[in-house]
Regions:
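Bacterial N-terminal signal peptides that target proteins for export
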Residues: 1-9
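A "functional boundary" signal
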Residues: 20-184
């Protein structure tokens, strides 16, 4: 009896172990797909769009975070293709699918859509929201530091386009200070 219990325990352990390895393998495979998509984005945007749609069709409903990331990359592709309406829709969808409800990079991307359309005040609002979110994150997190620098640089470009040159200079200097602080 004791031997049967031990055998069942060992069998259950191995099944769990195999299941964990498979799940980890699937996660690595999906991560590779995302990396491939990002690489394709720069080389062949049309091919990247086809690949992204294929991956989206193969996703399980519980893979919302990966779906959000793929939708975000699709939005970035459409920004690069100067199709802002389509890009904006993908960024909105990505934000809704994301587990992180306040994603500052999503705000940056939406701001980029408005910037591309010369809607300076809409873009400025999104960049300010992103900057606020990045400032609330732990200060030395690399992603947070880079995000603050990007938001500040984008705000400077907005102010330059609005011909508020003094404000633009302040934002550019602050962005430079953030980047210098990161280099230490």
């Amino acid at each position: 009896m004791r031997s049967i219990s031990f055998n069942i325990f060992v069998l259950a352990y191995f099944l769990l172990l195999i299941g964990g390895v498979k799940a980890q393998g699937d996660a690595i495979y999906r991560s590779t797909e995302l990396d491939s998509l990002k690489s394709l984005r720069l080389k062949s945007p049309q091919r990247a769009v086809r690949y992204a749609r294929q991956v989206l069709n193969e996703l399980n409903p519980e893979q919302l975070e990966l779906e959000s990331k793929i939708l975000n990359v699709l939005g970035e592709i459409y920004v690069d293709l100067y199709l802002p309406s389509i890009a904006l829709q993908y960024f909105i969808d990505a934000g809704q699918k994301s587990k992180v409800r306040k994603n500052p990079w999503n705000k940056i991307n939406i701001g980029n859509v408005y910037f591309q359309q010369s809607q300076w005040l809409e873009a400025k609002e999104r960049y300010l929201q992103a900057l606020d979110m990045f400032r609330r994150q732990s200060g030395q997190k690399e992603n947070s530091v880079i995000g603050r620098a990007v938001a500040l640089s984008n705000l400077a470009r907005i102010e330059r386009n609005l011909k508020n040159y003094d404000d633009a200079l302040v934002y550019f200097k602050e962005a430079l200070d953030v980047k210098r602080g990161q280099a230490k």
